[in-house]
C-alpha cells in the first residue's frame, strides 16, 4: 500500500513538473508596427514575432482589420487594399491576437493626391490646381500624355514616340471611352477633375493680352498667374505626329469641355510668341496631351 501511495505521489510530482516547464507566451509584436502607403503601392508584408522563440508554432492566430473596407487581412496575415483611391488619408489598425496577447500594425493609407502639392489659385482664377501633370514624379516633369476619354497613357514624359495604347481612330464610341466631363471618370486623384467651361473661361479672362498695346503691368500680372501655375512645356502627339512631338515650346493640357464634332477644349500656352494663352476648342480625338487637375 505504501508503494502505491509513493508511486502515485511521484506521478503527480512529475506531472506538476511538466506543467511548470511548459513555456508561456510572453510577448507578441508585429513588424512593421507602423507604415504609410499610397493606394497604388504594394502593402507591406507583416511579420509576427513572439517570445520565447518558437512559441507560436501550433497556436491559433486571429487577424482583424478595423477598416476592412479599406485594407483587409486574410486568415494567414496577408494584407490587401480594397480601394483604388482616397480623398483623405485613413488610419487602419491591423491586429494579431494569440491567446491573451495582441499586437498591432497601424497603417496610414493615402490617396493619389499625396503625390502632389496643391497650388491655390482661388484669388486669381477661382479654383485650386495641382502642381504637376498627372504621371509626373516632379513638378518639372511633363507627365503622361492622354487622348481625351482614354485613361491609359499613350506616352510619358520625354518619350519620343507614342506607345501601343495610342489609337488613331479613337472616339466616343471606342471601347473603354470615359466621359471626362465627370471628375470621377478622369485620371485625376479622387475629388479632382479637369477644368470646367467656367474655369477655362476664367483662365482665358485672367490671362488675356491684346496683340498690341498691353501695358507692362498687364503683362506682369499675366506672367505672375502663369508662373504660379507652374507650367512646363509639353508639346503633343497626334496621328500625323506619332513619332516626334510637336514643338516643346507649347504647354498643353485637356479640359472637361466637349466641343463640336467630337472635339474637346484644351489649354495652350505658347512660350515662343511672347506668352500668349489660347483656349483651343478643337482638340481632336487623335490628339494626345497631358492632364492637369483642378478643384474648386
Report the location of each language-model feature.
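Solvent-exposed, low-complexity, repeat-rich "mucin-like" stalks and linkers
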Residues: 29-59
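Extracellular/luminal low-complexity segments enriched in Ser/Thr/Pro
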Residues: 77-89
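A short beta-strand micro-motif common to beta-rich folds, especially ectodomain repeats
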Residues: 87-100
